C-alpha cells in the first residue's frame, strides 16, 4: 500500500485496520504484536457476547464481568482491551465497537437464567434495531456490576440486551478514561434520532466525530460526489 501510494500524484497514507474479536478463544490465537506493526488501529467488536447460541440469557455488550451472576457475562470488554494492551497495542489505536441493536431471549426469568427461543426481530430472529427498543411492555434496567443495560418484560418473560443512552454515555466516559482511540458501531441505520441517539450521545461526550480527509480518487465515477472525492 505504501509503495502504491508513492506512485500517485498526491501520496496518500492508506490506513490499514482490522475488526478484531473480543472473545479470548479468538484473540489468544492471534499474533497481535506482529499485526500491530502494520495496523493503524484496531476496531474491537465488543458485542454479541451472548445470543441464541447460549444456554442462558446474558449481556451482549457489557463492560465488566459479573462475579455475582457469571453466567450473564461470558465475555467482557474490560478484559479484552486489557489483553490487547498487554500485547503492546497502544490504547489510542483501540476503537471500541458498540451495538445499535439488541439480542432477545424468550421464556426466561432473567439474566443468567435458561431461555427458550429468541422470537422474531427487526431483520432476523432475535435481533431488534435499537430504534425499536424498548419493546411495548418492557422496562429498561441497568446492571451495576456488569456495567450493562437491558430491558425485561416480566409478563412475557422476554429479555433484550442492548445499549441505552445511559450506557452509551458510560462507555464514552470509559473510552476517555482509558485513552482509547474512539468508537464505532454496527450499524448506524438502527440508531434513534435526537437525544436518544447512541451515536450522538457518544459524540457529545468525546467532543467530535472523526474528520480525517478522504483519500478516494476516482475522477471517472458516474457519481458526482465520488468524482469530487467526497468533499461534501
Please provide the spans of the model-predicted regions.
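Noncatalytic linker/hinge segments flanking ATPase motor cores
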Residues: 80-87, 135-143, 224-231
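A broadly tuned preference for mixed-charge, low-complexity surface segments
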Residues: 77, 97-101, 150-154, 228-232
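Hydrophobic, secondary-structure "cap" segments at the distal end of domains
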Residues: 121-180
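Generic signal for short, ordered secondary-structure residues
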Residues: 14, 21, 153-154, 181
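Substrate-binding surface in catalytic domains of secreted glycosidases
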Residues: 1-133
Amino acid at each position: 500500500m505504501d509503495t502504491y501510494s508513492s506512485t500517485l500524484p498526491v501520496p496518500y497514507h492508506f490506513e490499514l485496520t482490522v475488526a478484531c474479536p473480543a472473545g479470548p478463544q479468538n484473540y489468544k490465537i492471534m499474533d497481535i504484536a506482529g499485526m500491530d506493526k502494520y495496523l493503524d488501529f484496531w476496531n474491537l467488536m465488543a458485542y454479541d457476547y451472548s445470543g441464541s447460541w447460549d444456554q442462558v440469557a446474558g449481556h451482549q455488550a457489557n463492560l465488566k464481568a459479573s462475579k455475582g451472576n457469571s453466567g450473564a457475562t461470558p465475555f467482557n470488554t474490560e478484559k479484552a482491551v486489557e489483553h490487547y494492551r498487554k500485547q503492546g497495542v497502544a490504547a489510542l489505536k483501540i476503537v471500541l465497537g458498540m451495538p445499535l441493536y439488541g439480542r432477545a431471549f424468550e421464556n426466561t426469568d432473567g439474566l443468567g437464567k435458561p431461555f427458550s427461543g429468541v422470537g422474531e426481530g427487526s431483520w432476523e430472529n432475535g435481533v431488534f434495531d435499537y430504534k425499536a427498543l424498548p419493546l411495548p411492555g418492557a422496562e429498561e434496567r441497568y446492571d451495576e456490576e456488569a456495567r450493562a443495560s437491558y430491558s425485561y418484560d416480566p409478563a412475557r418473560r422476554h429479555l433484550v440486551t442492548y445499549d441505552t443512552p445511559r450506557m452509551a454515555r458510560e462507555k464514552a466516559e470509559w473510552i476517555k478514561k482509558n485513552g482509547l482511540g474512539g468508537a464505532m458501531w454496527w450499524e448506524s441505520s438502527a440508531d434513534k434520532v435526537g437525544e436518544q441517539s447512541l451515536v450522538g450521545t457518544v459524540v457529545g461526550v468525546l467532543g467530535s466525530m472523526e474528520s480525517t480527509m478522504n483519500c478516494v480518487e476516482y475522477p471517472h465515477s458516474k457519481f458526482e460526489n465520488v468524482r469530487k472525492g467526497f468533499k461534501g
